[in-house]
Amino acid sequence: MAAPVPRGLSSLYRTLGWWSRQPILVTQSTTVVQVKTKSRFRPPTPEPKYKTEKEFLEYARKAGLVIPQERLERPIHLACTAGIFDPYVPPEGDARMSSLSKEGLTQRTERLRKNAASQLAIRKIREFDANFKTKDFPEKAKDIFIEAHLCLNNSDHDRLHTLVTEHCFPDMVWDLKYKTVRWGFVESLEPAQVVHVRCSGLVNQSNMYGQVTVRLHTRQTLAIYDRFGRLMYGQEDVPKDVLEYVVFERHLMNPYGSWRMHAKIVPAWAPPKQPILKTLMIPGPQLKPWEEYEETQGEAQKPQLA
């Protein structure tokens, strides 16, 4: 026997049954899905075992480790100086006066007075170079002078670097790239002699450099040709007497250093040098396309009638 159903509930059931028979509308919803790309592996940041440098030094000291002190310095190698310390002043009229004349004796007296500073410098140089002697050095300096100038004939710059300093090298090879040099040594008119010696420090007093000025009175030949073989300066078959004061330098602190040619002292009373011969191109006459140079030259040589 069925139980009675209340009126309100029966109407509710009928209503729900009607909605259940209706078609269901499905709506499309937008869904955002995050896609991860391949990320680069980043290792974790290591944590320092010692927070401060002081703790690290204390631990190293206990472990018996010696940590050298870090110096923010960069080594600089100075192979030569940039000039002459105390330039020698050649006496006026040198090599022209006799040593027995009054002027010659005066020059020798002044040279002896200035010799005191040179003696102190010689003692300083001998502390680093025990074999340095003023009697033997002039011949050695003359050999260096001759060999350095002969390197210009063959353009042997590698050998020239060992004979001259970095200060003297540009002065010797300047403007000789496309030229031919013919230099020759004939003879010595007077024995080479040391006239000036100086010793000084660069940057500090422990970095010592020695400079020796040698007087060379020689006879030489010199000729310079351009790249086309035309003579620009001098003559190969005409020797000339040359008086030069050459400065030689050495880095005394370098145990493997050697004496090299550093500079030349040119006195104010020295005669002027021979000018360089310059060749110029003289432009010819302007010709028309149908004219020839021989025809115009022949026309120019025709006599003009009055």
UniProtKB/Swiss-Prot annotation:
User: Signal peptide span per the entry?
Assistant: none
What do the Gene Ontology cellular component annotations say? Answer: mitochondrial inner membrane; mitochondrial large ribosomal subunit; mitochondrion
Keywords of the record, alphabetical order, are:
Mitochondrion, Ribonucleoprotein, Ribosomal protein, Transit peptide
Quote the subcellular location field of this record: Mitochondrion
Pfam families on file: Tim44
A Gene Ontology molecular function term of the record: structural constituent of ribosome
In terms of superkingdom, the source organism counts as: Eukaryota
Name any Gene Ontology BP term. Answer: mitochondrial translation
**Location (main, coarse):** mitochondrion
Q: How does this polypeptide assemble, per the annotation?
A: Component of the mitochondrial ribosome large subunit (39S) which comprises a 16S rRNA and about 50 distinct proteins.
Q: Indicate the family of this protein.
A: Belongs to the mitochondrion-specific ribosomal protein mL45 family.
Q: Describe its function.
A: Component of the mitochondrial large ribosomal subunit (mt-LSU). Within the mitochondrial ribosomes, required to direct the nascent polypeptide toward the tunnel exit and position the exit at a distance from the membrane surface.
Protein's name in the database: Large ribosomal subunit protein mL45
Q: Which organism is it from?
A: Mus musculus
Its gene is Mrpl45
